[in-house]
Each structure stands twice: as structure tokens, then as C-alpha cells.
Amino acid sequence: GYLDIADFILQNCTNVEDNLQELYRRVAFNICIGNTDDHFRNHGFLLTAKGWTLSPAYDMNPTLNEYQSLLINSSTNKSDLNGLLNSSEEYMLQKHIAQQIIGEVLVAVKDWKIVATLLSITKRGAFRYYI
């Protein structure tokens, strides 16, 4: 699951703290938008001059299932922000940092309908992604 990616970060990446926070942010985002097709091929790493780092996020689309493809912690893949928050230590994050990240993600996705309108996405197209 996601903790396998976290383990890779711990063992191989530079800026471990930043990469772990970014991974956690992506898990929270996937839960918030209903992207449950979040298998290992949707996560990558880039080798930079300073070392390995998470690649930019890609293939993050709502699929609206109740469970993630990957475990969000050591025991469940249920799409649940409380479960993610309660597992913050498994991502080597202090709880207040995890709360901040989840809060930022919630703020970022809350106005998706307004953004869809500004980008001229049809109501029919936007409704497909209603969350």
C-alpha cells in the first residue's frame, strides 16, 4: 500500500520529510476526490541531481468507490480521512502536520464546481465527477 511507497521514500529519497508530506497529501487528495484507482503504477519517482524524489502527481481521476486500491495504513484501504489522520505516525508525520495537510486538501477541493464553471466544463461533464 501507500506505506510501501513511504518506505521507499525513507530508504531512497532526498528531502524525506517533504516527500512523505507530499505522499500523505496525495493520499488525502485521492480520498477527497474519490480516486480509488490509485495503484502502484500511478506513483513514480524522478532521479534529480540531488537524488530520488516523488514525480509530479498524475492520473488522479474520481472513480467514486468506497475503498482505495492501496492500503492507506497498515490495516485498511477504506477511503476515510479519519483513518488516514489516525495513521499519521505511520507516515512519520506529527498529527498536527497531518491535520494541516488534510485541511489544505479540503480547502483545495471544496470549490471544484466553481473551478469547473470557470474552465467551461459542461454541467454534464462536471456531474460525472460530483463528489
Predicted segments — roles?
Residues G1-I131:
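Anionic ligand-binding catalytic core segments
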